[in-house]
UniProtKB/Swiss-Prot annotation:
It comes from Drosophila melanogaster. Residues 1-67, 178-199, 238-287, 380-414, 427-447, 486-531, 652-679, 799-820, 860-897, 1151-1181, 1231-1250 are annotated as: Disordered. Keywords: Coiled coil. This is Uncharacterized protein CG43427. GO terms for cellular component: cell-cell junction; cytoplasm; zonula adherens. The lineage of its organism: Eukaryota, Metazoa, Ecdysozoa, Arthropoda, Hexapoda.
Length: 1372
């Protein structure tokens, strides 16, 4: 390749060489033999000699003629050429080396600039945010000087050592706006860029206090390591020890006291780091260092910042109010610091005090923690002085004798007023529950209820004072609590009437009295007049109080176990438990309750006592946390073990001054408050009124008219509870009284097995075997702790004053509807409750109502005979007033309670679904009718009788997808995926599920029988699946022959005689429609390849139509002219053609006259287009324009070439005129006329009609529309401008059918156009024009400037008059 290049180069440069010989001399070969000879020379470059390859080499001469001739270039040329090559190579190399560093530098510069631009707005935002935080922090510090006051007090208590310690504290001046490390921006914190001095170097301070810095860092690390291993109690003790030893300075050890005192004597020259400026130091304010920012320095700075942050965090936990000193490397200012320093630049005239005021700052510390630490320290130092602020303690009353052990643990609890977030509140509540559960046992005697209620009031009072006016979000559980309270009042009223008939109930001892609670706050008395007693039975009163205290203790234990299940909203509900408690007489009664509960025959009495006395005191419908008590003992679950005593209160009673008009005077005494009554506040009244509004929507006027009676057949399952007092009669296992009717309940029944937190109805097992049914409530609170679940919640807040309420505000609620399937007399298994899955959603992203399926959809009812009560339509919530409670009729205890109750309220938050658990009951063995039934609809008729029932099988369950979950838990601020929901649901169910369930063999068989086996879905190919039978059959030719009854011989014989085309068409059509449809056996059919099912009609393709026309040529020809549409269409088309031709001809004729009258004569030019005038007379759709030589409408826009003789209007010269005429002509046919009999009659009849109509249209167009123009001067343009639609004429073979005629003409036949050329021409069309309705609309826009008399108004008036005249003519 190199030789070839050299050869080419030599070829181009032969003129520069002395010779172009084909050979060169060689020292060793004087004869010059060989084809290629190299030249011996200092130049190592080989040169190729030129040689013809095609010719043979000539014989070498005896002597080389070129022996003394040098054929190569001169040495100077070669040297120059080499230098040029080297120069080019060097140039190329230098260019490459020169480009690389420039490109790298450019990339680096671009990266730096882009990074600055990208981070610039972040820095600005961070600086602004820090500045705002600093301003707010300074404002808060000016408002509450807790740090200064506490340090002064500590200095006074500590004496000279305390003052020395106070003096040794370093208060840093650095603005926290300069520290952007917590924002993710690793900037330098050297911000002491004050204008007081510019030559101060922090290295001097660093060198002066190097030893102290080392000690400070060592002490900080040691303290940080020690603090992590201490609990909160040890931290508080460590704070006290530091305060007594005098080491409570800046977190240093005891060995630092020397440097601290020396720094104090030197005028408080504190240890200063590059980022901090001492507030009272004698040194000048530091200016930013001028060294470059390096990565090593940044890394070291980051490490030291992390160490400082950790030491500060531990120091804050231990009460160190000032962060430890950290030796920073010397760093200079950066652009970020320049921007940051702009916020704290001061004038030189400012004094040191002004600088201190501007830059005083407190190290990062949590204000709430700081206040709590110092308040606790002050309380301990005062040695029994004033007690500290009340902590958030719910169960101080239960500690009783163990107050000494729980005292240090109470220190852990934070002040309720200082809780900064819901997460902190939740953690504090969990710590309280853990501390309480670790220190409390069931056997501890319960202190008086008065003390406990007072402690609850103290714990909530401070938080409630900070709360805005209350707004309640109440679900079905709170409404059930309310109904239970009203129900007890009605039970008490009915008990007064039916006390003689209540003696046969199953009660060994008198039942505890019911809590009669009235809705309006009548008085603040605290007597026992609401409790009806036959005698002054002090033992029974004590029993009631004991049961109430036992229920409260059980509640608290359930609250402790629910700490992991409640969500963040429930944490706030625990703080809103009560506002105004009232004391109750003390009575330690838990042992008594346990003794009474151990007796199976007497088990129901304490249960009712717990039901009634454990109810939360009436606070005008204000309730605390709504939770459900799951009385299940995991160790003892045997469905067939014992009978179940089911009791529930499901009705809402009517409340008023005199709820029952026929009540006895004893009823009046039940109106005053009971011993749990508390004085209502404004928030309580608001809460109560809100619930009244809810209750008013629940009531139904029809319920008041029904007889309040219960029909309970022996096969029915009843759940009722009796709150009335019963005498101590011998126990009768089955009550002898029965209701007789069961009205449809409209209120929400309480879900079985899950009474509210303050239970109104507790299920107790009354078993002669002495065992406790695990599916019912435990009879002794000393057993294993009952499980707990969340069913409802109450959140109280003011949506107008809160930025973002924890949960959506309560919209107007509608009726909470629930279904109660009624059973027949046949006993059947029954699922009362089940635990639904949970879905974690965001309050702002909750679905709309009625989008979540009820939990009952997940269960299949095993009882096919069960009836569902109709769901009452909810009433609209009355707005604009707070209605009083209008009580509905007391609903009867349902025979069966639905699986769940869903609040289908219309609002922006999801329905709250009551969480239930499966309890299976069977009908009672025997139920007797009850005597002395009352007919008063308002009288309480459901004083409940205890019925025993035994558990039965659990019916089958249907698979429920995670998306159909009906319980929402607001635990996080973001929605979770279905997989997370499934996991959380499974975890919750596993935790709540009773352990060690042992089912009987029979029950297990029944469960297996009703269980639904879930099979995985198989992929099904639609194309391979059999197609469903359509009931039609494809009609084949053989089937047609078979249906005709022809055999093969007849068919062969018929082939000899060709049938007529008409017979073939008729036979095929009839047989296709009348063929019997046989249903073949379903088989695998490929839809794409299978035949189309017969539908009774025949699919006619275009080819078949052509074929039919070809075969039935004569038949079609004979029928087509006789069709009624033909004649009608012919007459109509002729009339439209004549009319339109006349209209267009007259407009052309009058165009020249109109142009003459509208423009002066000077502008007349032949064939000059007029853009201002545009005739918009459209071609009517139903008509056509035949090629009759007439001009089109488009010609009207041209000026005539011949001068017009009508120049009367030209006497008035016009300066300018723009005349636009828009005309629209619509031709409508009135009705098709009948076919004319003879053409002669139609011709005679057509002449006068055509002249009259033409005259009217002619006059109208001539005077108003047309420009008069001679038609012979211009050729027609309609053929060239647009194509015409030509209808049927005498010379046309095309039959065009208008779309409007398809509908208007009956009994007509239409044919597709045949492509055959030999289609005969139809007869001539008649001459009679069809009666048409021609509607003409004209819009004239004239803009002209007249020089003389003619005005725009006069011309417009003239045009209007002419138009009116023509319209009148057309109408006449």
């Amino acid at each position: 390749m190199e030789a070839t290049d050299q050869e080419v180069m030599l070829e181009g440069r032969e003129d520069l060489m002395s010779t172009s010989a084909t050979s060169s001399t060689n020292g060793g070969d004087t004869n010059g033999c060989g084809k290629k000879l190299s030249v011996t020379s200092p130049d190592p470059t080989p040169y190729v000699t030129k040689q013809r390859v095609t010719r043979p080499t000539p014989p070498a001469p005896s002597k080389n003629p070129m022996q003394f001739v040098q054929i190569k270039p001169c040495n100077l040329y070669q040297t120059a050429q080499e230098q040029l090559k080297k120069a080019e190579e060097v140039k190329k190399l230098k260019e490459v080396k020169k480009e690389e560093p420039e490109e790298w530098q450019n990339n680096l510069d671009n990266w730096k600039s882009s990074r600055r631009k990208r981070v610039e707005h972040i820095i600005d935002r961070a600086v602004e945010t820090k500045k705002l935080e600093l301003e707010e922090h300074d404002r808060l510090r000016r408002k509450s000087k807790t740090f200064t006051e506490m340090m002064e007090e500590r200095a006074e208590r500590g004496g000279p050592r305390g003052r020395a310690k106070l003096a040794s504290l370093a208060v840093y001046n650095e603005d926290e706006t300069n520290d952007l490390s917590d924002l993710g921006i690793g900037t330098s914190s050297a911000s002491g860029k004050s204008s007081l001095s510019g030559d101060y170097d922090n290295n001097s301070v660093m060198s002066d206090h190097a030893a102290e810095l080392d000690k400070a860092i060592g002490a900080a690390s040691s303290v940080a390591a020690g603090v992590t291993a201490q609990n909160v109690d040890e931290q508080l003790n460590h704070i006290n020890r530091n305060g007594s030893n005098g080491n409570h300075g800046n977190g240093a050890a005891v060995g630092q006291t020397g440097p601290s005192n020396s720094s104090k004597s030197a005028g408080r020259q504190y240890i200063s780091s590059p980022g901090y400026d001492t507030s009272s130091s004698n040194a000048q304010a530091s200016s930013p260092d001028l060294c470059e920012y390096t990565y090593e320095g940044a890394i070291q700075d980051y490490k030291q910042r992390v160490q400082r942050a950790s030491s500060n965090g531990n120091g804050n936990a231990n009460g160190k109010l000032i962060g430890e000193h950290i030796a920073y490397p010397t760093r200079r200012g950066s652009k970020i610091e320049d921007r940051l320093s702009g916020f704290e630049v001061t004038s030189p005239s400012d004094t040191q005090e002004g600088v201190e005021k501007q830059k005083v700052d407190v190290p990062k510390v949590d204000i709430s923690k700081r206040k709590e630490i110092f308040e606790q320290a002050k309380a301990e130092v005062s040695n029994g002085g004033a007690p500290a602020a009340p902590k958030l303690v719910f169960r101080d009353g239960l500690t009783n004798g163990n107050s000494a052990t729980t005292a240090p643990k109470s220190e852990v609890r934070r002040l309720s007023g200082d809780i900064s977030s819901i997460r902190d509140r939740m953690q504090s509540l969990e710590q309280q529950r853990k501390a309480f559960s670790s220190s409390k046992s069931v056997d501890v005697p319960v202190p008086p209820l008065k003390q406990r209620l007072n402690s609850l009031q103290q714990s909530v009072a401070k938080e409630e004072q900070k709360k805005p006016p209350l707004v309640a979000l109440i679900d079905a559980r709170q409404l059930e609590i309310m109904r239970g309270e009203e129900e007890r009042m009605r039970q008490q009223q009915q008990k007064e009437k039916h006390s003689p008939s209540q003696t046969t109930l199953c009660a060994p001892k008198p039942a505890p009295p019911a809590l009669i609670i009235e809705e309006p706050p009548v008085a603040d008395t605290n007597d026992d007049s609401g409790i009806q007693e036959d005698t002054a039975d002090e033992l029974q009163q004590q029993q009631q109080l004991n049961a109430a205290i036992a229920a409260l203790a059980l509640e608290e234990r359930q609250l402790e176990e629910a700490a992991n299940a409640v969500n963040q909203i429930e944490a706030e509900f625990d703080e809103l438990t009560d506002l105004h408690p009232s004391p109750l007489p003390p009575s330690p009664a838990l042992p008594a309750v346990q003794q009474s509960l151990q007796q199976p025959t007497v088990a129901q009495v304490p249960a009712q006592a717990v039901n009634q006395a454990a109810a939360p005191p009436l606070r005008d419908m204000e309730f605390s946390v709504s939770c459900t008590n799951n009385f299940i003992e995991p160790a003892k679950i045997s469905p067939c073990d014992v009978n179940v005593v089911a009791a529930s209160a499901v009705s809402v009673s009517k409340s008023g001054p005199t709820p029952n008009p026929t009540s006895t005077p004893n009823m009046v005494s039940s109106s005053p408050n009971c011993n749990l009554r508390r004085k209502p506040s404004n928030e309580m009244v608001h809460h109560r009124n809100l619930l009244k509004m809810f209750k008013e929507t629940f009531q139904n006027d029809d319920d008041l008219k029904e007889v309040c009676e219960i029909v309970t057949s022996p096969g029915q399952f009843t759940q009722i509870i009796d709150f009335s007092k019963r005498p101590s009669n011998p126990p009768i296992p089955i009550p002898t009284l029965l209701p007789t009717s069961t009205p449809i309940p409209t209120q929400i029944p309480r879900p079985l097995g899950k009474p509210p937190m303050s239970p109104k109805a507790v299920r107790l097992a009354s078993s002669p075997k002495g065992h406790i049914n695990p599916l019912s409530s435990p009879t002794n609170s000393g057993f294993s702790p009952p499980q707990f679940s969340i069913n409802g919640r109450v959140e109280i807040f003011n949506s107008r004053q809160l930025d973002k309420p924890p949960t959506p505000p309560a919209p107007p609620k509608k009726t909470v509807r629930s279904e109660h399937p009624l059973k027949e007399a046949v006993p059947s298994p029954e699922v009362v409750m089940c635990a639904p899955p949970m879905t974690i959603v965001d309050p702002d992203e909750l679905p709309k109502p009625n989008t979540v399926k009820a939990l009952s959809n997940c269960f299949s009812q095993s009882d096919s005979k069960s009836l569902t009560s109709p769901i009452m339509s909810p009433k609209p919530l009355p707005s604009g007033r707070i209605p009083q409670i209008t009580p509905p009729a007391s609903p009867k205890p349902p025979k069966r309670v639905q699986l769940d109750e869903v609040d289908r309220s219309s609002g922006d938050y999801a329905p709250v679904v009551g969480q239930t658990k499966a309890i299976v009951h069977t009908p009672p063995s025997k139920i007797n009718a009850r005597a002395n039934q009352t007919l008063d609809p308002l009288a309480p008729n459901d004083s409940l009788c205890l019925h025993t029932s035994s558990p039965s099988e659990i019916p089958s369950l249907k698979a429920c997808s995670p998306n159909e979950s009906s319980l929402f838990k607001l635990a996080s601020s973001r929605p979770t995926s279905p997989s997370v929901d499934v996991a959380s649901c499974q975890k919750f169910l596993n935790r709540e599920a009773p352990k060690d369930i042992q089912l009987a063999e029979e029950d297990r068989k029944r469960m297996d029988q009703f269980a639904v086996e879930e099979m995985p879905c198989d992929k099904i190919d639609v194309t391979k699946s059999p197609q469903p039978n359509t009931g039609f059959q494809i009609v084949t030719e053989d089937l047609v022959k078979k249906c005709d009854g022809k055999n093969i011989s007849e068919a062969v014989r018929d082939l000899d005689v060709p049938p007529s085309q008409e017979d073939i068409a008729l036979c095929a059509g009839l047989l296709d429609c009348l063929a019997p449809a046989q249903e073949p056996i379903c088989d695998s059919i490929d839809v794409r390849n299978g035949p189309v099912p017969a539908t009774g009609f025949q699919d006619i393709s275009e080819e078949e139509v052509k074929k039919c026309e070809k075969h039935n040529k004569n038949y079609v020809i004979t029928n087509r002219p006789s069709s009624p549409i033909g004649s009608v269409r012919a007459a109509h088309s002729k009339a439209l053609m004549d009319t339109c031709e006349q209209i267009i001809a007259e407009e052309r004729k009058a165009s020249s006259q109109m142009m003459k009258t509208s423009l002066p004569e000077s502008v007349e030019k032949p064939s000059t287009p007029l853009p201002g005038r545009k005739s918009k007379i459209p071609i009517p759709k139903p008509c056509c324009i035949s090629a009759s030589g007439t001009d089109s409408i488009s010609r009207a826009g041209y000026v005539p070439t011949a001068p017009s003789h009508l120049s009367g209007s030209a006497q008035q010269p016009l300066i300018a005129r723009t005349h636009v005429v828009e005309t629209e002509i619509k031709v409508k046919e009135i009705s098709p006329p009948s076919i004319p009999k003879t053409p002669e009659q139609t011709q005679l009849h057509a002449s006068p009609t055509k002249e009259k109509k033409a005259k009217n249209i002619f006059d109208f167009l001539r005077r108003n529309f047309g420009h008069q123009e001679e038609p012979q001067h211009h050729s027609t343009l309609n053929e060239t401008l647009e194509k015409k639609v030509v209808l049927t004429s005498t010379k046309s073979g095309v039959d065009v059918v208008n779309a409007d005629e398809f509908v208007r003409v009956d009994n007509s036949k239409f044919y597709l156009a045949s492509e055959l050329e030999d289609v005969p021409v139809p007869p001539p069309l008649p001459k009679t024009p069809a009666p048409v309705n021609i509607e003409i609309r004209k819009k004239i826009t004239t803009n002209e400037i007249l020089e003389e008399n003619t005005t725009e108004q006069a011309l417009t008036q003239e045009i209007s008059d002419l138009l009116d005249d023509e319209i009148m003519k057309l109408e006449n």
